Swiss-Prot record:
It comes from Homo sapiens. It comes from the Eukaryota. Its EC number is 1.15.1.1. Disulfide bonds join C63-C208, C125-C207. Residues 1-18 form the signal peptide. Its cofactor is Cu cation; Zn(2+). SUPFAM superfamilies: Cu,Zn superoxide dismutase-like. Belongs to the Cu-Zn superoxide dismutase family. One of its GO terms (biological process) is removal of superoxide radicals. It catalyses: 2 superoxide + 2 H(+) = H2O2 + O2. The gene is SOD3. This is Extracellular superoxide dismutase [Cu-Zn].
């Protein structure tokens, strides 16, 4: 493709010489300067095309989690980030969840995380509305029903692939809220109305609004994920 662009540039240069009546074998200084300018522009365009191709058309989004403004002093202050990547508009969603600030006891407790309908944090996480449920299906079949996450030593770090939510199309979660709950999701098995609406997951501890971003945050988190896996394998080998 770069060769094609350069060929077009040379043809254009020849045409420029013909229009000015100059001998194409000895272009004047104006023609040489024009060729240099055009070459710089073509190079810039080519670099942009290659950068976009390297991104493979993937969509990225980030959500900076902050404690709900309505929490009382006794509640934990959960902070962190949730990152999303979708390789194509119809592809499944991948996500990194990296949160801290949970109580350290009891260890290995589970917390629910869901997408809620509104990106409205004017009244803390309470104003984010119900679960985002564009297809009017029962919980836990909402696209943003991410389920339960194990908390260890006050933090939560997890990679999940194949999520049903999307960053593209009419049911995009961009502009909506991710909410971290105080309790565990009963996955619709609680036997009451709240169970099929929100999984009886308890108070809304922290939340954020999903926003489009570049690939940099995801790439850094992916490198950290790879390093964590490597350290875990090394630790397991030493223990064995």
């Amino acid at each position: 493709m770069l060769a094609l662009l350069c060929s077009c540039l040379l043809l254009a240069a020849g045409a420029s010489d013909a229009w000015t009546g100059e001998d194409s074998a000895e272009p004047n200084s104006d023609s040489a300067e024009w060729i240099r300018d055009m070459y710089a522009k073509v190079t810039e365009i080519w670099q942009e095309v290659m950068q976009r191709r390297d991104d493979d058309g993937a969509l990225h989004a980030a959500c900076q989690v902050q404690p709900s403004a309505t929490l009382d002093a006794a509640q934990p202050r959960v902070t962190g980030v949730v990152l999303f990547r979708q390789l194509a508009p119809r592809a499944k969603l991948d996500a990194f969840f990296a949160l801290e600030g949970f109580p350290t006891e009891p260890n290995s407790s589970s917390r629910a995380i869901h997408v809620h309908q509104f990106g409205d944090l004017s009244q803390g996480c309470e104003s984010t509305g119900p679960h985002y449920n564009p297809l009017a299906v029962p919980h836990p079949q909402h696209p943003g029903d991410f389920g339960n996450f194990a908390v260890r030593d006050g933090s939560l770090w997890r990679y999940r692939a194949g999520l049903a939510a999307s960053l593209a199309g009419p049911h995009s979660i961009v502009g909506r809220a991710v909410v971290v709950h105080a309790g565990e999701d009963d996955l619709g098995r609680g036997g009451n109305q709240a169970s099929v609406e929100n999984g009886n997951a308890g108070r809304r501890l922290a939340c954020c609004v999903v926003g489009v971003c570049g690939p940099g945050l995801w790439e850094r988190q992916a490198r950290e994920h790879s390093e964590r896996k490597k350290r875990r394998r090394e630790s397991e080998c030493k223990a064995a």
